[in-house]
Structure formats: C-alpha cells, structure tokens
Amino acid sequence: MSLRRGDLVTVAAKGPYTGKPRPALVVQSDRLSQLASVTVCPLNGELIAAAPLRVRIEPSRLNNLRQPSDVMVDKLSAVPRDAVSEAFGRLSAAELSLVDVGLRLLLEM
C-alpha cells in the first residue's frame, strides 16, 4: 500500500486514544515508506479550540471528511501498517503546514 504524508486514512489499531477505527492523518516522511509502522495523528469530531495542537479541518472535496474535525497533533503515534486503510482523502498544503507548526511545538524542533 502506498501512503504519502498528508493522506487521510482510517486506523483500526487499539490504543489509549484509539478504541475504535478512526480517521487519522499520515505525518511520517514519504522516505520512510519501507517501515512496518506508520506515524499518524488521529482526527476527532469533538472540536476544541487548542491551536496549534488541534488543527481544525473543514470538509472539502480534497479531504472527503463528512464533518469538521480536529487533527490531534498531541496524540501522535505509530501504528502497524496493516492496521491502516488506503487513503480516503488528503489535507491541503496550507492545512498540512498548520499541522507542522503543532508538530514542531510538540517535539521542540
């Protein structure tokens, strides 16, 4: 399966913040596609104002979301590649740029 940074996928891995299949954003570098895991930030439909650690994404033709959702940048995790679906949408370059701001803050980069 070919995934790219910025893709929106469904993750079906159980974890502290993923009790059910949920949409997530692929944030891992495209150069690391050979890894057995994929680094993602989950999305949540329960919206809270907490920028830059929550990035609001409005539904669009590009992302195929059904409702406004927040990318939970502070819930960054690696999941097994076989628990990740094919991409159902993508973020715009501007939206991904906002996620990058949150990642730099979270990781002190």
Describe these PLM feature segments.
Residues M1-M109:
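Conserved functional hotspots at enzyme active or ligand-binding sites that engage polyanionic ligands
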